[in-house]
């Protein structure tokens, strides 16, 4: 991939996030997002034919950060190596954001924070897409966020 390709990618996602392209630094993250963008939602899905929110997060963390996280949003929320917090003021790229969208579960949806109030997720209505935590639908369903604590992560098997 050439520098020009990165420039195009940075410009594209800077537009989605309403930030300047120079703020798009994690190229592997945005390449992953670009590869999965607009993939349809499918509950329990784990591939390009359809994917759900927690599978998207699991694949993203594995592909971009080489970090293995649990399969479901509930397991991700309760993972002991995630430092949870309620405020959205200090969100940074890579933080998981948890929502209660259905049922009696504490958590039923997960996305990953990008920048400027935007997060990547796989939603039942839009598939893999970028949404705003300030959108009334999401802000009213926000449970909290979590930052992976590298010190507490289980060691990966080779």
Annotate each PLM feature.
Residues 26-34, 54-58, 91, 142:
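Extracytoplasmic/secreted envelope proteins and their assembly/folding machinery
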């Amino acid at each position: 991939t050439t520098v020009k390709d990165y420039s195009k990618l940075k410009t594209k996602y800077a537009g989605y996030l309403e930030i300047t392209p120079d703020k798009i630094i994690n190229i592997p993250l945005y390449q992953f997002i670009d590869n999965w963008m607009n993939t349809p939602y499918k509950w329990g899905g784990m591939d390009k034919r359809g994917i759900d929110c927690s599978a998207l997060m699991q694949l993203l963390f594995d592909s971009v950060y080489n970090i293995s996280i649990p399969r479901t949003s509930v397991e991700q929320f309760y993972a002991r190596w995630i430092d949870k917090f309620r405020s959205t003021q200090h969100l940074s790229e890579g933080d998981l954001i948890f929502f209660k969208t259905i049922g009696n579960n504490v958590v039923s949806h997960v996305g990953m924070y990008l920048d400027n109030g935007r997060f990547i997720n796989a939603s039942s209505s839009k598939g893999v897409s970028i949404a705003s935590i300030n959108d009334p639908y999401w802000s009213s369903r926000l449970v909290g966020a979590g930052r992976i604590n590298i010190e507490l992560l289980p060691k990966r098997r080779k």
